[in-house]
Amino acid sequence: MWCLERLRLGPECLRRSGDWLLPGRARGAKSRTTAACANVLTPDRIPEFCIPPRLMPRLALAALRNSWVEEAGMDEGAGRTDWDPRSQAALSLPHLPRVRTAYGFCALLESPHTRRKESLLLGGPPAPRPRAHTYGGGGGPDALLGTLRVPRAPGPATPAAPGCPRPPQDALARRPRGCRLLRVPDGLLSRALRAGRSRRLTRVRSVSSGNEDKERRAGSQSPARAPSTSPPSSRVPFPERLEAEGTVALGRAGDALRLAAEYCPGTGRLRLRLLRAESPAGGAPGPRAVSCRLSLVLRPPGTALRQCSTVVGRSRKASFDQDFCFDGLSEDEVRRLAVRVKARDEGRGRERGRLLGQGELSLGALLLL
């Protein structure tokens, strides 16, 4: 009857009751299955979940954390509440202050970006660097920046330079420890000031004629070569420059040009500057209606020696301020030379190249040589 009852229940019941019928055989089959599939997870065999250990030993990590807490001057318990440098990179920085919140974990006292913004906008400049690392000379923007710099940390009172503002003590106390990071914007500021000053000087030089730069270089090179040729005791003073102004009449209309002559005997350079145009009445004429080309020719009686020319465009200014330089002239040559000025029309059409006027002036009589 029992067998018939089992057959009536079906094959599932027989499979479940097979272990009861043959207990030794069932235990052997289970042990073989477990040994063959040891890595398979089953409901009756689930391993315990364990957290892998840290790569750094706990003692070394605790010692490092304690040293950081002591250096930052914060509560040691606040550092242990939520310490994980891998997940909280900001908390792993020792110079950032930390505090324990009401919820029991550690947090930053302030944002790490706050002090950076304050240092750019409100922080004072750092201590001055030694002069060996600077590019500028004595006075200038570098010296001004150096007088306004203050020490990085509040220390004993030092006498400030007269006329230099001193920052308040609370501003000095609020400054962060990483003040050396502020040297970068300070260096960029001083470099920008030096670049702006050099650009302004370049623009000033470009407005004036390039002949003045050549004369300045020639004048600076000649005294530099003087000590090598003669002893310092017998140094001869640099000869003075001869300067004079004169007027050159152009044609029969009575128009004239005002010239300024400057001659340096040491360098042998003669500079002629066109100052302005004059009317027959002696005053400044009206606006020039045409553009003209002015040619200056240095010629002894009979032959032409050197020639320079320039184009003067239309302008409402009566002054020309054009320079013509001639090099390698001795006093004897300058004494015998005369300057001839020609003005030609530089307009368009048939009038182009028409002679507007010409005149001549003796340099020896002008410079009193």
Swiss-Prot record:
Residues 151-176, 197-240 are annotated as: Disordered. Residues 253-369 form the C2 domain. Keywords: Nucleus. It comes from the Eukaryota. The keyword Nucleus applies. One of its GO terms (biological process) is positive regulation of acute inflammatory response. SUPFAM superfamilies: C2 domain (Calcium/lipid-binding domain, CaLB). Signal peptide: none annotated. Residues 153-168 have a biased composition (Pro residues). Specifically expressed in endothelial cells. Induction: Up-regulated by pro-inflammatory cytokines. It is found in: Nucleus. Residues 220-237 have a biased composition (Low complexity). May be involved in inflammatory process. May regulate cell architecture and adhesion. Belongs to the C2CD4 family. This is C2 calcium-dependent domain-containing protein 4A.
